[in-house]
């Protein structure tokens, strides 16, 4: 069954139980099929795997899903709304940018260490030192090396701005969310964790 054939196919069926592994696009299809009146249940793939009886094929996977969805002890995944998926996309993007920021800081520190300059840990220390390089604070570092390090620092500054924008979006979304507010009353749970749990 091709993707474009899914909705017409399920539209013709009487409402029934549909089991799917909770993976890429499953929440979208869960919403679409639920709108047609079907009962959709998403299951973590790791739990479905226990019901696979033979090699990994589409038929064996479908059989395992059919078996797993009828089990009374199966743990199901709630179908996420578009709003919940949006905030999860924000979290994933923020996480990616933070990892890239860490890589850039480490690269700047490593490049400077090659010239005998040790930078204290932290983004601000790296950016401050790069600013001093531009002003000529280390004349023995070749101009080409300074250009390369400055390019990394510019990218780092850009990432800082982007992460700041995502943090503002996260705060704005969380401000009106009762679940996030309730979760934040738990000691040690901040806005990032609370919004991720709420999504």
Where are these regions (language model features)?
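A detector of single, family-specific signature residues
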Residues: 1-199
């Amino acid at each position: 069954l091709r993707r474009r054939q899914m909705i017409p196919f399920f539209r013709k069926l009487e409402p029934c139980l549909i089991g799917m592994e909770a993976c890429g696009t499953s929440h979208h299809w869960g919403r679409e099929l639920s709108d047609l009146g079907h009962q959709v249940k998403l299951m973590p793939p790791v739990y479905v795997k226990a019901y696979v009886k033979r090699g990994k094929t589409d038929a064996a996977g479908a059989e395992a899903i059919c078996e797993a969805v009828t089990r009374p002890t199966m743990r199901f995944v709630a179908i996420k709304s578009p709003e919940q998926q949006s905030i999860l996309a924000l979290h994933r993007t923020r996480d990616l940018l933070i990892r890239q920021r860490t890589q850039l800081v480490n690269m700047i520190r490593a490049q400077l260490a090659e010239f005998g300059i040790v930078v204290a840990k932290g983004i601000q220390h790296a950016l401050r030192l790069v600013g001093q390089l531009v002003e000529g604070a280390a004349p023995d570092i070749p101009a080409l090396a300074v250009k390369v390090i400055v390019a990394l620092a510019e990218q780092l500054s850009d990432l800082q701005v982007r992460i700041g924008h995502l943090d503002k979006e996260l705060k704005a979304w969380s401000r009106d969310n009762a679940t996030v507010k309730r979760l934040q009353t738990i000691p040690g749970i901040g806005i990032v964790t609370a919004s991720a749990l709420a999504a």
